[in-house]
Each structure stands twice: as C-alpha cells, then as structure tokens.
Amino acid sequence: MPSVIENDNNILTVKISGDIDHHASKELRLEIDREIMHARPKQVIFDLTECEFMDSSGLGLILGRMRKSSECGCDFKLVNPGAKTMRILRMAGVEKLIKIESVDL
C-alpha cells in the first residue's frame, strides 16, 4: 500500500493507493500518528481515490486515526472512496461516525 502524507496549510492529507490490509496498516498507522502528534493539523483527510481494497485492518486504521485526530482537536474526514471501499465502509457503519465526501482534490 503506497501512501503519501502531505501537510499543507495545516491540513494533513493521507493519500492511500492500492490495498489497506494487515500487511501495511501498522507501519502507516505509526507514520500518521507521528505526523498528527507533531504537526497538530486542524484537519486530517484520508483520500481514498486510489484505494482498491480494504479489510478489517483498514477499518481499524481509519477509526483509530479518527480517534487520534479527535484527541488532538482536529477534524477528520474521508474523501473519494470508490464503490467497493464505500460498500465496506457502509457495512461497518463508518458513514455514521465519519464525514465522507466525494470531492476533487
């Protein structure tokens, strides 16, 4: 799961490409947490435009970063999930907990 983490104008954007699974979740989780704690952004955005697959580890990654963001006082949202990813998010009830948008970044 290649990913890019950008901090621009106090907005931390995590761009996920490929799969969010147990193989890559731990390393990415640590990297994102470090950035949230260091930068203290006003908003964290997970850009799922290029996310092709997500398992329960991916859901855990997202929900954990939502909680970490909340603890630091910053907003959290997901943008541009594809149909397969959105189906998993809906099945897990994530759309009731996290703002999900379709936008052009």
Residue ranges and their predicted role:
Residues 1-52, 67-105:
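STAS-like cytosolic regulatory interaction modules
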Residues 55:
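ABC-family nucleotide-binding domains
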Residues 62-65:
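Aromatic/hydrophobic pocket-lining residues that form π-stacking "cages" and hydrophobic walls in ligand
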